[in-house]
Amino acid sequence: MPAQIISGTELSKNIKFNVAEKIQHYLQQGKRAPGLAVILVGADPASQVYVGSKRRSCEELGIYSKSYDLPAETTEQELLTLIEQLNQDPQIDGILVQLPLPEKINSTKVIEHISPTKDVDGFHPYNVGRLCQRIPTLRACTPLGIMKLLETTGVDLYGQHAVIIGASNIVGRPMALELLLAGCTVTVTHRFTKDLKSHVHQADILVVAVGKPHIIPGEWIKEGAIVIDVGINRVDGKLVGDVQYDEASKKASFITPVPGGVGPMTVAMLMFNTLLAYESHS
């Protein structure tokens, strides 16, 4: 039996609708709108697309969005000074610095400079630490979106063996913490992992976030597994994931498509986090 599709497109619409509804409620009470500052350094085409989609979502939902498109020559100190100003701005609840940054700018230093209460990307060590301590506040958008997708399957996550392919700070590592919090037994694989196939084959829940097209053959998937494909790769003009979708969907019980799976959830959770930050500041 073919896998059931987990649609991020549909779920993200519901989440955005709920966020917009809450914002309208606050506005009707005479309160200000939530504010999000979006900073883009340089003119990377992919980053421009992502930033554009975030700004459009803000407009749709009633979030006040302030844009800062900085030239590639911007120095690290100039960026840190801007972030400090935004940290002090009472109209701004969330600060988003689009990654990757130019090589000469230390992204870790930049992330650490954002006030933890305005870190709507959920990357600040304080917020990652809270998740690690099982008291999360602002959580990384993609892993949080994946947890929302997993909820829609109705599968009890307690005791499930979750395998994560990729150990990035943006997806893999916070994803491991989210799944631990949900009661899973978690394995994280990375570039030094030996016998990747055997790890994949043991996964009740498989999260793949590598950024390499079709790196996971469908035949590796365990019968009945839930497959979450975070990868977005362009091959011959088409967007494809990190998993061989056609084969994997014959073995999995649930699977996310690419596009229309995890991607829309990342932006939806950014809007959700911005509302959360606004509520904490109010």
UniProtKB/Swiss-Prot annotation:
Record-stated family: Belongs to the tetrahydrofolate dehydrogenase/cyclohydrolase family.
Protein name as catalogued: Bifunctional protein FolD
Any one GO CC term of the record: cytosol
Pathway(s) per entry: One-carbon metabolism; tetrahydrofolate interconversion
InterPro entries: Aminoacid_DH-like_N_sf (IPR046346), NAD(P)-bd_dom_sf (IPR036291), THF_DH/CycHdrlase (IPR000672), THF_DH/CycHdrlase_cat_dom (IPR020630), THF_DH/CycHdrlase_CS (IPR020867), THF_DH/CycHdrlase_NAD-bd_dom (IPR020631)
Biological function: Catalyzes the oxidation of 5,10-methylenetetrahydrofolate to 5,10-methenyltetrahydrofolate and then the hydrolysis of 5,10-methenyltetrahydrofolate to 10-formyltetrahydrofolate.
GO biological process: L-histidine biosynthetic process; methionine biosynthetic process; purine nucleotide biosynthetic process; tetrahydrofolate interconversion
Binding residues for NADP(+): 166-168, 232
A GO molecular function held by the record: methenyltetrahydrofolate cyclohydrolase activity
Catalysed reactions, semicolon-separated: (6R)-5,10-methylene-5,6,7,8-tetrahydrofolate + NADP(+) = (6R)-5,10-methenyltetrahydrofolate + NADPH; (6R)-5,10-methenyltetrahydrofolate + H2O = (6R)-10-formyltetrahydrofolate + H(+)
Record-linked SUPFAM superfamilies: Aminoacid dehydrogenase-like, N-terminal domain, NAD(P)-binding Rossmann-fold domains
Subunit structure: Homodimer.
Organism: Histophilus somni (strain 2336)
Keyword Hydrolase: yes
Pfam annotation, one family: THF_DHG_CYH
EC number(s) stated in the UniProt entry for this protein: 1.5.1.5, 3.5.4.9
HAMAP family, per the entry: THF_DHG_CYH
Keywords annotated in UniProt: Amino-acid biosynthesis, Histidine biosynthesis, Hydrolase, Methionine biosynthesis, Multifunctional enzyme, NADP, One-carbon metabolism, Oxidoreductase, Purine biosynthesis
Xref: PROSITE patterns: THF_DHG_CYH_1 (PS00766), THF_DHG_CYH_2 (PS00767)
Stored Gene3D superfamilies: Leucine Dehydrogenase, chain A, domain 1, NAD(P)-binding Rossmann-like Domain
